[in-house]
Amino acid sequence: MRSSICPAEDATKYAEELRELADKMANKALAKKESRFFKSLADESRVRVLKLLMLREMCVCEIMVALNLTQPTASHHLGILEKEGVIKRKKEGKWVYYAIVDSEILEGMNKLGLLN
């Protein structure tokens, strides 16, 4: 009995099916975007920022005080999260407020157990 995993009688056709499957399920461009997203979460401070922003939008100074970060450090982390589309900013006069872009991001992180 032959395995259906690697049917050798038509290797060329099977190889093409595998490439199509990879294009559909493991698209390189999408994987690159997803890896950048996860890289943006690969820092304890950025995860803590997200946990704060789950509660409400906050200005940089609130995040600095809450997490005991300097202004340059807080801005650095916020910039990375904003660049990857995880958070957005809104300027009101002299104040810049940050909020999570999409609640689906939080739902996905919660399903992965990243927000417990």
Regions found by a protein language model. Give the residues of each.
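N-terminal leader segment of winged-helix/HTH proteins
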Residues: 1-40
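Alpha-helical residues within the helix-turn-helix
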Residues: 65, 76, 82-83
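Pre-recognition alpha-helix immediately N-terminal to the DNA-recognition helix
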Residues: 47-49
